[in-house]
């Protein structure tokens, strides 16, 4: 698997349009039918004309209906307490397991995610 990155920042005043993003994606070799794993940091991309949706639409247009875009939407708050980095006291694990809310693909919020992730999840064709 090849890993490539696009750098859009020239300075914070840079205005980026969907067409600019498409051009850079095509220069990276993104083509119709590809499978992309995308982790975006849109807060550092300058001014996005159209916001995160402009990036999403540029990606979708580049890969087309034949392609797939995968965006990580981790929900570590649903991990078993025994597997957490900052474990709660062991005597509370059973109660935590009993009272834990189940994962819900529409309602479970990705933790610490970029606004790009939240916008991506709002799109009709997205499966989670």
Each model region followed by its residue ranges:
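N-terminal and secondary-structure boundary signal
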Residues: 1-128
């Amino acid at each position: 698997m090849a890993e490539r990155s696009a750098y859009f920042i020239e300075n914070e005043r840079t205005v980026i349009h969907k067409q600019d993003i498409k051009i850079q994606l095509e220069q990276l070799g993104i083509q119709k039918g590809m499978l992309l794993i995308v982790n975006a940091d849109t807060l550092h991309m300058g001014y996005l004309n159209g916001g995160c949706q402009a990036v999403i639409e540029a990606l979708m247009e580049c890969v087309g209906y034949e392609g797939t875009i995968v965006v990580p939407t981790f929900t570590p708050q649903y991990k078993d307490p025994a597997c957490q980095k900052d474990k709660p006291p062991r005597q509370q694990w059973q109660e935590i397991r009993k009272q834990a809310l189940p994962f819900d693909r529409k309602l479970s919020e990705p933790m610490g995610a970029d606004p790009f992730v939240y916008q991506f999840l709002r799109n009709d064709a997205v499966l989670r």
